C-alpha cells in the first residue's frame, strides 16, 4: 500500500511522522513524507521519498488560531490532494495539527489515520480542561474549578467545530466528515492520565524518535567532555514558545557543581566554552546514553527521549503543552520544573544537584520509561495496518496511568 505521512515543519510533529514513515517502509509499504522543505534533504538521505507541504509561507492571518488550524488547511487541502493523487497515494496518516491531511483524504476519498505526537488532549468528563496539567479536583472548590474549565473547553470545541465545518464547506465538503479510521497517541502510557471515557479507535503507540542529525554529512556527534563527573545534557527547545536561557543557566550550575555538560544544537555554538562543556550540532542519542540528567523545555519529543532512557529532567517550560508535560512529570516524581520567569542560576544549580544526588528521580523516570518498553514505531506501523484493514477492529487500549489524576 502507498501511504502518505503528512505533517507540518515543526520538529515535534515532523520527526514523529518521519519515524512512523520509516517503520511503515520497513514493513514493506511504499511511503511518501509530506512536510516542511527544511527537512527534505535529511529525509531523502534517510531513504524516505519526501515532498514539500504546499502553501506553508507565513501569513498574517496565522495570528488567528482558527485560520492557522482550519483556514490554512482548507487552502492547502486541494493542492495537497492533487499532489497525493498524482503520487498514487492510497491512504494518509495526518499529524493532528496538520488538518490539511485530513481534508485531503476527504477530497480523495481515501482512508486516513490521525497521528498525535503527545499525550491525548481530548475533552473528558472526568478531568479538568486538557493541557492545563491540573490534578483532578478533590474538594468542592477544585471540583467547581474543573466544571468551569470543562464548560469553557466545550465552548471552544463548539467554536472549533464551526470553523472546521466552514473550512470544509469552502472545499465543497458538505456531507458528514469522514472520521479517521484510527488515532495513534505517540506517548508513553505512563504519561497518560487515566480517564473514564477513553475514546474508541485510539491507541497509545509509544514515542517515535527520529533525529535528522543521523543523516547529516560529516561528523555526526558532539564530542563528550573529558572526565568522569556526571554529565548534564541540555536540549534547546524547538517549540516556538520555548524558554530561553537554558544553556546559560546550565553552564553556571555545572560549574558550581563540578559537572560536565553537553548540548546538541541545530547550529554551531559561538563563543568560548570551558573544557568540561561541549556544544554543537550532532546526534542526541550518543550524548543521552552518557547523561545523568536532562535539562529541557518540556516539549514532548525530548521529554520522551529522556524517559525512555530513564533520565530525570529539569524542565523550564516555555508555553503550550510544555506546562502540562512539566506538571505531569513533577507529579510522577521524574522532574523538577522551574517557570521561565523564576529561572535563576541559583535555582537551576539547586535543581540539578537534587536530580543528580537523589536516586528517587531516576527511579521515577525509569518507571515511566518502562511503560513504553514494548511500544514504538514498529508497533505504531502495525496499528496503522490494522486501522486500514476494514476486516479488523481495534479494541481500546487500557490506560494504566502512573501519574496521579
Language-model region placement:
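A short, glycine/small-residue-rich beta-strand->loop->alpha-helix junction that serves as a flexible
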Residues: 6-19, 241
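Long, low-complexity segments enriched in small/aliphatic residues
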Residues: 157-207
Amino acid at each position: 500500500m502507498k501511504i502518505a505521512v503528512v505533517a507540518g515543519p515543526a520538529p515535534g510533529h515532523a520527526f514523529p511522522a518521519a519515524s512512523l514513515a520509516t517503520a511503515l517502509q520497513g514493513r514493506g509499504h511504499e511511503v511518501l513524507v509530506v512536510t516542511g522543505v527544511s527537512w527534505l534533504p535529511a529525509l531523502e538521505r534517510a531513504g524516505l521519498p519526501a515532498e514539500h507541504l504546499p502553501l506553508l509561507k507565513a501569513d498574517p492571518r496565522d495570528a488567528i488560531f482558527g485560520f492557522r488550524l482550519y483556514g490554512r488547511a482548507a487552502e492547502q487541502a486541494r493542492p495537497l490532494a492533487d499532489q497525493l493523487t498524482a503520487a498514487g497515494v492510497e491512504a494518509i496518516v495526518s499529524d493532528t495539527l496538520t488538518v490539511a491531511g485530513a481534508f485531503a483524504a476527504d477530497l480523495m476519498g481515501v482512508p486516513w489515520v490521525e497521528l498525535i505526537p503527545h499525550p491525548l488532549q481530548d475533552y473528558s468528563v472526568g478531568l479538568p480542561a486538557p493541557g492545563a496539567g491540573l490534578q483532578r479536583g478533590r474538594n468542592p472548590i477544585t471540583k467547581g474549578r474543573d466544571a468551569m474549565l470543562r464548560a469553557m473547553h466545550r465552548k471552544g470545541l463548539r467554536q472549533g467545530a464551526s470553523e472546521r465545518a466552514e473550512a470544509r464547506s469552502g472545499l465543497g465538503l458538505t456531507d458528514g466528515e469522514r472520521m479517521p479510521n484510527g488515532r495513534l497517541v505517540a506517548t508513553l502510557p505512563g504519561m497518560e492520565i487515566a480517564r473514564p471515557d477513553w475514546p474508541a479507535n485510539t491507541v497509545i503507540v509509544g514515542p517515535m524518535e527520529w533525529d535528522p542529525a543521523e543523516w547529516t554529512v560529516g561528523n555526526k556527534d558532539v564530542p563528550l567532555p573529558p572526565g568522569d563527573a556526571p554529565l548534564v545534557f541540555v536540549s534547546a527547545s524547538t517549540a516556538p514558545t520555548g524558554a530561553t536561557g537554558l544553556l546559560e543557566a546550565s553552564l553556571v550550575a555545572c560549574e558550581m557543581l563540578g559537572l560536565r555538560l553537553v548540548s546538541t544544537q541545530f547550529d554551531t555554538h559561538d563563543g568560548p566554552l570551558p573544557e568540561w562543556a561541549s556544544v554543537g550540532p550532532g546526534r542526541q542519542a550518543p550524548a543521552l546514553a552518557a547523561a545523568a540528567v536532562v535539562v529541557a523545555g518540556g516539549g514532548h519529543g525530548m521529554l520522551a527521549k529522556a524517559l525512555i532512557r530513564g533520565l530525570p529532567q529539569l524542565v523550564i517550560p516555555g508555553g503550550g503543552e510544555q506546562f502540562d508535560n512539566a506538571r505531569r512529570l513533577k507529579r510522577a516524581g521524574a522532574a523538577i520544573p522551574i517557570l521561565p520567569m523564576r529561572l535563576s542560576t541559583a535555582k537551576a544549580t539547586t535543581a540539578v544537584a537534587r536530580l543528580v544526588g537523589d536516586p528517587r528521580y531516576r527511579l521515577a523516570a525509569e518507571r515511566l520509561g518502562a511503560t513504553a518498553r514494548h511500544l514504538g514505531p514498529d508497533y505504531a506501523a502495525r496499528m496503522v495496518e490494522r486501522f486500514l484493514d476494514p476486516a479488523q477492529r481495534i479494541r481500546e487500549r487500557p490506560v494504566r496511568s502512573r501519574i496521579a489524576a
